[in-house]
Amino acid sequence: MIGEWNNGTGRRKSSVARVFIKKGTGKITVNDKDIQAFFGRQTSIMICRQPLFLTNHVETFDIMINVHGGGESGQAGAVRHGITRALIDYDATLKPALSQAGFVTRDAREVERKKVGFRSARRRKQFSKR
């Protein structure tokens, strides 16, 4: 498996995706399901495929993905990041184009923690003068 598969790990919010690519017909499997069945929204599928469209490798690779944690949007972002890293592992000359598009950089935005005395992260408790 090590010789023919290239891999990459992607992260976004609280989601982690392990991506394995090999030469094939363009079949994408997420957690043993087809990508259409796993992601309900078309925008999530588009986000996942962005690195492949950018590098013109849509029908070149079979992709196997294991993803856990977070919601649909975070998982789609993690898959995109993982596919990008796997493509760079396959061919390092793709890195400048992927980096220019902003796919190589890990999106570091996380949920801000709830503070003591507040209702949420920044929303304060209602104040009453009387």
Curated annotation (Swiss-Prot):
Which Gene3D superfamilies does the record associate with it?
Answer: 3.30.230.10
GO-annotated cellular components? cytosolic small ribosomal subunit
GO:BP terms for this protein? translation
Q: Which UniProt keywords apply?
A: Ribonucleoprotein, Ribosomal protein
- Mitochondrion among the record's keywords? no
Give any GO molecular function from the UniProt entry. Answer: RNA binding
User: This protein's superkingdom?
Assistant: Bacteria
Give any Pfam family that matches: Ribosomal_S9
Read off the SUPFAM superfamilies from this record: Ribosomal protein S5 domain 2-like (SSF54211)
HAMAP family reported in the protein's UniProt record = Ribosomal_uS9_B (MF_00532_B)
The record's listing under PANTHER family reads: RIBOSOMAL PROTEIN S9, SMALL RIBOSOMAL SUBUNIT PROTEIN US9M
Annotated family: Belongs to the universal ribosomal protein uS9 family.
Q: What is this protein called?
A: Small ribosomal subunit protein uS9
Species of provenance: Polaromonas naphthalenivorans (strain CJ2)
For this protein's source organism, the top of the classification is: Bacteria, Pseudomonadati, Pseudomonadota, Betaproteobacteria, Burkholderiales
Q: Which gene encodes it?
A: rpsI
